[in-house]
C-alpha cells in the first residue's frame, strides 16, 4: 500500500464533526467484501481508531488482512461524504486501552445523553474489546469547497 495520506483541514473538520458514523469495509477469507457500520475517532495524528467486541467477523478480518476502507457520509446531505482507504497499523488487545477507547467513543456518540453512554460503557466492560488504529493511505472526498 502507498505511504500515509495527509488529511486536509476540510476533511479533518468533516471527520471530527459529532454524530458521524462510518461504514467500515474489510475482506472476508474468501475475498468477499464485508461492511459494518462503526463508531470511529479521528486521532490527532490523522489516524482513525475503531473498536469492537472481539469475536465479530470484521475484527477477525482486520487481524488477518489489515486492508480496509471507511465511508463517512454527511447525515444531512447524502451527496457529501469522505471515503478513506487504509491499513491497520496497530491492533490493541490491552483491555485497559481498548475499554478506554470504547468509553470515549460512547461518550462522544452519546454526548447529549451521558446516562445512556454510561449504561453502554457498563455493558461494554463485560466484553473483551479490541481497538484498531488505521493509517489512511488514500482520501476521496465529495465535499463543498
Residue ranges and their predicted role:
Residues 1-23:
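Short, basic/aromatic recognition patches
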Amino acid at each position: 500500500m502507498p505511504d500515509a495520506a495527509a488529511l486536509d483541514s476540510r476533511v479533518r473538520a468533516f471527520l471530527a464533526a459529532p454524530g458521524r458514523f462510518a461504514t467500515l469495509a474489510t475482506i472476508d477469507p474468501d475475498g468477499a467484501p464485508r461492511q459494518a457500520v462503526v463508531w470511529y475517532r479521528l486521532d490527532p495524528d490523522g489516524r482513525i481508531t475503531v473498536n469492537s467486541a472481539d469475536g465479530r467477523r470484521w475484527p477477525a478480518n482486520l487481524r488477518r488482512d489489515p486492508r480496509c476502507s471507511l465511508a463517512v457520509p454527511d447525515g444531512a446531505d447524502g451527496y457529501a461524504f469522505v471515503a478513506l482507504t487504509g491499513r491497520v497499523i496497530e491492533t490493541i488487545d490491552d483491555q485497559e486501552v481498548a475499554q478506554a477507547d470504547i468509553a470515549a467513543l460512547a461518550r462522544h456518540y452519546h454526548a447529549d445523553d451521558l446516562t445512556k453512554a454510561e449504561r453502554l460503557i457498563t455493558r461494554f466492560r463485560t466484553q473483551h474489546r479490541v481497538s484498531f488504529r488505521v493509517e489512511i493511505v488514500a482520501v476521496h472526498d465529495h465535499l463543498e469547497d
